[in-house]
């Protein structure tokens, strides 16, 4: 169930989506069967870090303030011959995949009881969303397979090419609510 949000605005008879560059927006849901919260946050700023602030485009935050999965839209695709031979076809740039590693390693949150300490490992995975229409062909790509291995990689995401992202989100939800019978998830 949706409990609150700052994304969709209704003014008189007009509905608008309010995603502003550089500004954070959020939707909060509550899982009916468990009461666990789930957040979808656009432009979440992680700025209380011991090093450099991090700001991925989209963050799905599960159940608490300390568990995140990042979906970061990068509107680039790499398809040079050497890349395709090494990774198995067109896909996200290696630079963008490395950014996902950086997010996972760099994002930490302050420890609730010890102000000088940080909880690490709060980002359980991160994927690049990149423009590519051929999802079935991409399934054999190295950066698709790496998601199942290390939870870092890339997924195609375009209008009409959303199945792999939907599968990933369904998988994340199933693992978060794995203690429930599948009919209540």
Task: Please report, for each region that a protein language model flagged, where it lies by residue.
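Catalytic core segments in nucleotide and nucleic-acid processing enzymes
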Residues: 2-185
